[in-house]
Design a protein with these regions (language model features):
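Preference for extracellular/luminal or secreted protein segments
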Residues: 7-65, 70, 286-287, 305-406
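A short aromatic-anchored loop/beta-hairpin motif
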Residues: 65-79, 264-265
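Second-shell residues forming the walls of enzyme active-site clefts
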Residues: 27-32, 50-62, 81-103, 113-115, ...
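Substrate-binding cleft of extracellular glycoside hydrolase catalytic domains
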Residues: 103-147
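Bacterial N-terminal signal peptides
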Residues: 2-10, 108
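Divalent metal-dependent hydrolysis catalytic cores, especially in the metallo-beta-lactamase
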Residues: 72-78, 160-168, 321-325
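A substrate-binding/cap region within the structured catalytic cores of diverse enzymes
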Residues: 129-159, 164-198, 202
Length: 406
């Protein structure tokens, strides 16, 4: 595939004009509770096929019907969902046409070992050895060019979000999962590369993500398989792990992905960072000032699903301040759990609206059209509603249930 020169120079539109804000509020006003909750879930295509043998490479009639009942806000494409260029473009187009609200279509395309398209045998795309090799050049322009190149070919196929670049610092030699996916063992150098990469993605018109907050590079375990822990204090994290994340935020990154790591010396709650109000709301939102979309790492990873039921982890993440629940192990259970949490008051609807606003704003920034049956003009809220979540009450219920089960 030849990447069009027009795509390479495509900049992301601004999503913060008064007109854009009005469109978000208009859409929010007309949405049902299930539609709002659906925006919070980004899943693999097969999550919408509840049979044992889903057809992963196309949108089936069954999946279309399930999408009506579980109207997710985005899909995440993996190698198993891809056959060739034509099929991939059709898959994405079919999902977009089937969704009432345009979807975020995301992929892990970091360059190096994690590149669902470039490493696929059916594609002839630019390949990179690793982020580490880019960082080793000491030239941020190399990171910018990689972001621009990857963003351009993803956009050509219909993607609008890349779960890249990696902002972790590879500070623990025993780490089994980050390694060469990180730009450097040096936080300052990693920060320079992250800044340039974010700028490169945006120059290509591609939304991008820094991950895995608050830094998976310092752990000695892989959260895909179980508990992973960083023993650094918050002050130590601010001196190292936070530098690339702060750089990405300053560069205007669109999304921050959380890690399921526990940080016992940085927070007192004992929870994985993805479920920690201290780490998400107080630190990422408060101290670092990030106002964009926060997405969990996959909730189906063992660091979460071994200890929390799908509904529990979904609601706890929202109570912590997360916006998007990525790939729960059971979409229906997690989705229905969030519905129940709103209905019983554990999660206020305005807390829900807070995240939906951010997600819709992100979609506008991607150039997706939110218009439809929404009225052209809707009044904005006259007061600031209660956005609290009964977080302590929810945790009491969660741990009480765990004790009862034990």
């Amino acid at each position: 595939m030849v990447v069009s020169a027009a795509l390479v120079g495509a900049m992301l539109p601004s999503a913060f004009s008064e007109e854009a804000t009005d469109a978000v509020e208009a859409k929010l006003t007309e949405m049902t509770l299930r539609e709002k909750v659906g925006q919070l879930f980004w899943v693999r295509p097969e999550a919408l096929d509840f049979s044992l043998n889903p057809e992963k490479k196309k949108l089936t009639q069954t999946m279309r019907q399930n999408l009506e009942q579980y109207p997710v806000g985005g899909i995440v494409v993996f190698k198993g969902n891809i056959q060739d260029e034509s099929q991939l473009s059709s898959l994405i187009a079919d999902f977009q046409s089937a969704s009432k609200i345009p979807m975020i279509v995301a992929v892990d395309e970091e360059g190096g070992s994690v590149a669902r398209l470039a490493n696929h045998e059916a594609f002839s795309l630019p390949k990179y050895k690793s982020a580490r090799d880019i960082g080793a050049t000491g030239d941020p322009e190399q990171a910018r060019q990689m972001g621009r190149t990857i963003g351009s070919y993803l956009r050509a196929y219909g993607f609008n979000l890349d779960f890249a670049p990696v902002a972790d610092v590879d500070s623990n030699p025993a780490n089994p999962v980050i390694g060469r996916r990180a730009y450097s063992t040096d936080a300052q150098q990693a920060a320079q590369m992250v800044t340039a990469a974010v700028e490169g993605f945006h120059e290509a018109g591609m939304l991008c993500t820094v991950k895995h907050f608050p830094g998976h590079g310092d752990t000695g375990q892989d959260s895909h398989y179980g508990t992973a822990t960083s023993y650094k204090t918050w002050e130590e994290m601010k001196a190292t792990e936070m530098l690339p994340f702060e750089a990405g935020i300053a560069a205007g990154v669109d999304v921050v992905m959380t890690a399921h790591i526990t940080t016992p010396n940085a927070t007192a709650d004992g929870l994985p960072a993805s479920l920690s109000y201290t780490m998400i709301t107080e630190r990422l939102r408060g101290e670092l000032g990030f106002q964009g979309v926060i997405v969990t790492d996959a909730l189906g990873m063992n660091a979460i699903k071994k200890y929390f039921a799908p509904a529990e982890s979904a609601v706890a993440a929202l109570c912590a301040g997360v916006d998007v629940l990525l790939m729960p192990s059971d979409l229906r259970a997690a989705f229905d759990g969030v519905i129940r949490a709103v209905e019983d008051g554990t999660l206020s609807e305005e807390r829900l609206n807070e995240s939906v606003r951010r997600i819709l704003t992100l979609k506008q920034k991607a150039g997706l059209d939110l218009r439809g049956s929404a009225a052209a003009e809707q009044p904005l809220p006259e007061k600031t509603p209660d956005t609290k979540c009964s977080f302590s009450d929810w945790l009491k219920k969660l741990w009480s249930g765990a004790d009862s089960a034990a």
